[in-house]
Regions:
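Basic/Trp-rich segment in TM-proximal cytosolic loops or flexible interdomain/linker regions
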Residues: 96, 163-336
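Internal catalytic domains of large membrane-associated glycosyltransferases
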Residues: 1-191
């Protein structure tokens, strides 16, 4: 499929071409990326579950990152393996039959996909028009709109993928994902979509737009701080025997900080607890002490990387809003 006669729509075009040419002969199709793989036993189990539920249109697994060797890659792999199940089980419980599609490591009922998941060509030019770049969210939404179930089964292990080995490689991929997610705004108010799918789309948009909001918040805070340092404090703005002292609401500031940290760190804490309590998993990380040290190192490094990602993603959003198209750049898939 790298050499289709009409090589359009990239990965979505590969799937569409296969469905039109060969899909009629197969009850289901298993979608993988170039850097993902699954065990034979899991493939058989996925096919069994799909066959057992006639109303199920798509079954998504949780891919585990493997084969990372660089520091950044190992950081992603550790976070994926330890924190991933906590997030995944929460998402699966919340989504139910209205889950999402991640584009790979999933099995799809061919007839359901062919009948209901054809992607439109959006009016206008890229980055918001043209072919849909990030096809997976929209295909899941279209399947759900047609009445098919989309489910995320987190108990299906031996589902694997590789991750970009460096931050620069992640940012190259993020530029395309950012454009695809912002392009999804064209579908946010489409007729017939389920509420959960609209929330999937909105959360995907906010995954990148929030970086710009964070940057703007910091910029406004910096401007206000500079302004305050150059503005004399007026202790007597009106006639009074007593001065009017500046008010700083430290209690609310601390509350906001604690709540923000809880949102960021609580899932990681829960994952650490489950890792400690599961003896087999804990020993796989080298025991309780090494697991705890690894979590602390990951938290510190993630906090160091976060401002860099914020600036880069803010730039991505700005470029897209001003009409810059990312195209589809090749991705480095090894640590060399």
């Amino acid at each position: 499929y790298r050499h289709r006669r009409k090589n359009s729509e990239r990965k979505a075009g590969n799937i569409s071409d296969w469905v039109m040419r060969w899909g009629g002969g197969y009850e289901a199709m298993l979608v993988l990326d170039a850097d993902s793989i699954m065990s034979g036993s899991i493939m058989v189990e996925m096919a069994r579950r799909l066959e057992a539920e006639p109303g199920l249109g798509l079954l998504q697994t949780l891919p585990n990152i493997v084969l990372s060797e660089s520091l950044y890659g190992r950081l992603q792999q550790f976070a994926n393996r330890l924190y991933g199940p906590v997030f995944a089980n929460g998402l699966a419980a919340w989504h139910g039959y209205g889950s999402n599609f991640w584009g790979h490591n999933a099995i799809i009922r061919t007839r359901a996909f062919a009948d209901s998941a054809h992607l439109p060509v959006l009016s206008g030019k890229p980055p918001f028009g043209g072919h849909v770049i990030s096809h997976d969210f929209i295909e899941a939404a279209l399947l759900r709109r047609a009445g098919w179930g989309v489910r995320f089964d987190t108990d299906l292990e031996q589902s694997y993928e590789e991750a970009p080995p460096s931050m620069s490689d992640v940012l190259i991929r993020d530029r395309r994902w950012c454009q695809g997610n912002l392009q999804h705004s064209r579908f946010l108010f489409a007729r017939g979509l389920a509420l959960t799918n609209r929330l999937h789309i909105l959360s995907g948009i906010m995954a990148y737009a929030s970086a710009l909001f964070w940057f703007m918040l910091l910029a406004v805070g910096m401007v206000l701080t500079i302004q305050a340092s150059f503005t004399p404090t007026d202790y007597f703005p009106e006639f009074s025997l007593f001065p009017s002292w500046p008010v700083f609401d430290s209690e609310r500031a601390i509350t906001l900080f604690v709540q923000s940290m809880a949102i960021v760190l609580l899932p990681k804490f829960l994952a650490w607890v489950t890792g400690i309590l599961n003896l087999r998993r804990c020993l796989g990380y080298g025991g309780p002490l090494l697991l705890t040290i690894s979590v602390l190192v990951e938290v510190v490094l993630s906090a160091m990387f976060a401002p860099v990602m914020m600036l880069a993603q803010s730039q991505m959003v700005r470029e897209i809003l001003t009409g810059s198209d990312s195209g589809w750049k090749p991705q480095r898939r090894n640590d060399g």
